[in-house]
Amino acid sequence: MLPPKYEDNTLQIKEKSTERAAPFFVLEVTARSAADILGIHPNSAVLFYRKIRIVISHYLALAANEVFEGAVELDESYFGGRRKGKRGRGAAGKVVVFGILKRNGRVYTVVVDNAKSDTLMPVIKQKIMPDSIVYTDSLSSYDKLHVSGFIHYRINHSKEFADRQNHINGIENFWNQAKRVLRK
């Protein structure tokens, strides 16, 4: 299950308990709440959750070199900080995360310094095959896509959120789910 470099025999949780704890992880129940429900030591549940995250991280790293093709959605989101003050693009104290969603497939995310074209275009060219259909919002950073070998469609959120296939609802939903989980 785990790659050898992640082997750790310090976790003392019975196999039966791991089988019972795994669904709680999937349902996004906190480790401490799962421990209370299962009647195990909270530290055991925390360590078990950490091991699951390590395994997930390992397999995601193996898939990190995947190149997307076909219909993909691009968007950036801002994480961290408090809701005080400026929100959205340019919000101070927040981390910019750029995401690529393959429709009906995987999502690739990467922390970037900013959402400018010079920052995003190298990631886009590395992760998306030329001639792919790329859907974005109206951010000016995506202006170069149509001259970079991609079929580019924009959605103007001030007018509408979807126009048949022209939308970025998939990646927007991903951001919503990620932020909801991280708030826990």
What kind of region is each of these model predictions?
Residues 1-184:
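Residue-level recognition of single "structural anchor" positions
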